[in-house]
């Protein structure tokens, strides 16, 4: 995401809202990520701009209320006529179904498109992968789903 932002390949209104179980501030997240970001001196100001657009919500994977809070946080930034939402999921198979149900039931935007990016491989084997695909098909339309390889993510 940093490289896309750095190279001006994202819409100027883009915001990033992270969600995970770990209680972190954006400053702590920035500190943890910095060694991997490869920021040269010419882009340090742009790097700070990037982090100013980042927000973070800590919550459980199985708590509907936590996903309602995530939805509220995302909603704070939807001020225009159109607001698209893209959810990037990199989850352990054990919580995948629960999280996707909560996203579907509490976090889908009403003012634009919603996209779900699923990082493959998901599941433990072919059977569990097929089961997760069937689960996703019950929640989202195919044009909402994007499956990408782990190494591309």
From Swiss-Prot:
It is found in: Cytoplasm, Cytosol. One of its GO terms (biological process) is NADP metabolic process. NADP(+) binds at residues 21, 120. Pathway: Carbohydrate degradation; pentose phosphate pathway; D-ribulose 5-phosphate from D-glucose 6-phosphate (oxidative stage): step 1/3. One of its GO terms (cellular component) is cytosol. Keywords: Carbohydrate metabolism, Cytoplasm, Glucose metabolism, NADP, Oxidoreductase. GO terms for molecular function: glucose-6-phosphate dehydrogenase activity; NADP binding. It catalyses: D-glucose 6-phosphate + NADP(+) = 6-phospho-D-glucono-1,5-lactone + NADPH + H(+). D-glucose 6-phosphate binds at residue 120. Its main location: cytoplasm. Its EC number is 1.1.1.49. PANTHER family: GLUCOSE-6-PHOSPHATE 1-DEHYDROGENASE (PTHR23429:SF0), GLUCOSE-6-PHOSPHATE 1-DEHYDROGENASE G6PD (PTHR23429). Belongs to the glucose-6-phosphate dehydrogenase family. Cytosolic glucose-6-phosphate dehydrogenase that catalyzes the first and rate-limiting step of the oxidative branch within the pentose phosphate pathway/shunt, an alternative route to glycolysis for the dissimilation of carbohydrates and a major source of reducing power and metabolic intermediates for fatty acid and nucleic acid biosynthetic processes. This is Glucose-6-phosphate 1-dehydrogenase.
């Amino acid at each position: 995401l940093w490289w896309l932002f750095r190279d001006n390949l994202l819409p100027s209104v883009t915001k990033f809202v992270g969600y995970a179980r770990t209680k972190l501030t954006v400053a702590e997240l920035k500190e943890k990520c910095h060694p991997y970001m490869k920021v040269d001196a010419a882009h340090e100001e742009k790097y700070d701009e990037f982090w100013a657009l980042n927000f973070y919500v800590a919550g459980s994977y199985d708590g509907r209320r936590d996903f309602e809070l995530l939805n509220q946080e995302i909603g704070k930034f939807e001020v225009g006529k159109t607001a698209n939402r893209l959810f990037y999921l990199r989850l352990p198979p054990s919580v995948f179904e629960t999280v996707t149900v909560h996203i579907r039931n509490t976090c889908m935007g009403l003012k634009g498109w919603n996209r779900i990016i699923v990082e493959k491989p998901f599941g433990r084997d072919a059977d569990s992968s097929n089961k997760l695909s069937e689960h996703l098909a019950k929640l989202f339309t195919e044009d909402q789903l994007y499956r990408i390889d782990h190494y591309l993510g």
